[in-house]
Amino acid sequence: MKISVVINTYNASKLLAQTLESVKDFDEILVCDMESTDNTLDIAREYGCKIVTFPKKDYTIVEPARDFAIHAASNPWVLVVDADEKVTSELREYLYHYIEQPDHDDALFIHRKNMFLGKWIKGSYPDSQLRFMDQTKATWPTTIHSHPIIDGTVGHMPKDVKYALVHAGFSVSNQILKMDVYTEEDLAKRQQESVSFTQLIFAPLWRFIKYYFIDGAILDGKAGFIKAYFSANMKFYYLAKVYERQVSKKHS
């Protein structure tokens, strides 16, 4: 059986070539582009990718294009890869072997090896993502960080890191930009109505303690500390926006 790799892109030229190099041995590479203005499509053409376009409109996240992308693939089995991820040869071989088994599931959670500032943030592992599926049985919701809905059974990859997607992760600058985007989307998705002063103080603090000490980022040196601090800031920014909306409603 054949497998299509599906990659959603928007101005993804920085790391796209190394991603495409890592998936060149799959049967098909489909790039679903949201009207990039850089040379993303030039790189995709160099690798012989099938290219489809999803209108950018005012979207700030990729999820609205996910369902369109997976169903544009030529093969039922699809592996969804982000433009800043790499697929190991061990993962590729495992997936091809897996779909030949008579008792396989209809989708698989795949683990991610998250890199930050050149270091593997081990505390974030396995960071499981539902990325391998029979697209004829999948529907992908448009909300941020959503997983596809599978009309069938779902399994998990072995936790051995050699089978993980390698995620390059964000630079510090991109991390800061993404915090604003993600908190705006979470604000719309969760519809939290109010926040207390206690939450403003202790929820970000607990997020830092959990990420840094409990999840093990303390073992990842300066990169782990910075990543934990970003995680706490993300929580604080979200709660601050909830409070901003709370105040706005009182005065409207």
PLM-predicted stretches and their roles:
Residues 41-74:
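Conserved donor nucleotide-binding strand/loop of the catalytic core
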Residues 17, 38-47, 90-91:
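Acidic helix N-cap motif at the loop->helix transition within catalytic regions
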